[in-house]
UniProtKB/Swiss-Prot annotation:
Keywords: Amino-acid biosynthesis, Aromatic amino acid biosynthesis, Lyase, Schiff base
PANTHER family from the UniProt entry: 3-DEHYDROQUINATE DEHYDRATASE (PTHR43699:SF1)
Species name: Thermococcus kodakarensis (strain ATCC BAA-918 / JCM 12380 / KOD1) (Pyrococcus kodakaraensis (strain KOD1))
Pfam (any one): DHquinase_I
Residue numbers annotated as active site: H112 (proton donor/acceptor), K139 (schiff-base intermediate with substrate)
SUPFAM superfamilies referenced in this protein's UniProt entry, alphabetically: Aldolase (SSF51569)
Gene3D superfamilies per record: Aldolase class I
Gene Ontology molecular-function annotations: 3-dehydroquinate dehydratase activity
Protein name in UniProt: 3-dehydroquinate dehydratase
Gene: aroD
Length: 213
C-alpha cells in the first residue's frame, strides 16, 4: 500500500488534492501549510489520513515551534485520523503519544537521519528503544551514502513487524521499492519530491511488481 504525501498551502487546497487522487492513505504534511484555518474540513477523509507537523530540523517544510505543533496535534486528533506522526527525538513525543492513546489515534513514531546511515548495531538498538514506547508503527529513515546502506536498513525487517524502513537519496531508491513490499505501507508524493529520492507512485509500483511479481 502507498500513502500519498500531500503538501498544500492550506486545508482547503489539501482537501482538493485528496479528492482528485486515488490513494488508500494520505500523509498530510501540516508543516507545508501557510494557514491552518478550516482544518476540520479534512475530517471527511480522516480515516485515510496521517497528520505530520514536523519541525524544520526534522525535515519540515516551514518552521513550526513545539507549542504550535502540540496545538495542531490536539486539533487533528479530534478528527480521529488513522495516524499522527511524531519524531522519536522530539521533546513533545511522549506527550503526543499520551494524547493519541487517550483519543484512540494510531501513532507512527519516526526517526530520520539526513546525513547518513548508522551501523546495524546502532540501528537495532534504536529500533528496540522505539519499540519500548509501543507505537502502532515505527518508521526509520536514513540517508544512503553507499548501496550497502540499503542492506543495513532493510535488515531491520527481520526484527520487527509494523515497521517502515528505507533510505533517502538517489542511492536509497531501491530500499523504497523493497519497503513497498515489506512495510505496512510506504510513501510517494502526489506531486514533485517531498524527500530526497522519492519515487512517484506509478514508478514505485512498477518496480515493485518487477521485483516481486
Amino acid at each position: 500500500m502507498i500513502a500519498g504525501v500531500v503538501t498544500a498551502r492550506n486545508p482547503g487546497e489539501a482537501l482538493e488534492k485528496i479528492k482528485t487522487s486515488k490513494f488508500n492513505l494520505y500523509e498530510v504534511r501540516l508543516d507545508s501549510f501557510e494557514s491552518f484555518e478550516g482544518l476540520e474540513v479534512l475530517g471527511e477523509y480522516s480515516k485515510k489520513l496521517i497528520f505530520t507537523p514536523r519541525r524544520r530540523e526534522e525535515g519540515g517544510i516551514r518552521p513550526l515551534d513545539d507549542g504550535t505543533r502540540l496545538s495542531l496535534y490536539r486539533r487533528v486528533m479530534e478528527l480521529k485520523p488513522a495516524y499522527v506522526d511524531v519524531e522519536f527525538a522530539s521533546d513533545i513525543a511522549q506527550e503526543v503519544m499520551e494524547l493519541a492513546k487517550e483519543k484512540g489515534v494510531g501513532v507512527i513514531l519516526s526517526y530520520h537521519d539526513f546525513n547518513g546511515t548508522p551501523d546495524f548495531g546502532k540501528l537495532l538498538t534504536l529500533l528496540e528503544d522505539m519499540e519500548e514506547l509501543e507505537p502502532e508503527i515505527i518508521k526509520i529513515v536514513t540517508t544512503a551514502n553507499s548501496p550497502l546502506d540499503n542492506l543495513r536498513v532493510l535488515r531491520l525487517y527481520e526484527h520487527a513487524e509494523n515497521l517502515i524502513a528505507f533510505c533517502m537519496g538517489p542511492l536509497g531508491r531501491i530500499s523504497r521499492v523493497f519497503s513497498a513490499q515489506l512495510a505496512p505501507f510506504t510513501y510517494a508524493p502526489l506531486e514533485g519530491e517531498v524527500a530526497p529520492g522519492q519515487l512517484r507512485a506509478e514508478e514505485l509500483d512498477r518496480l515493485r511488481v518487477m521485483l516481486f511479481g
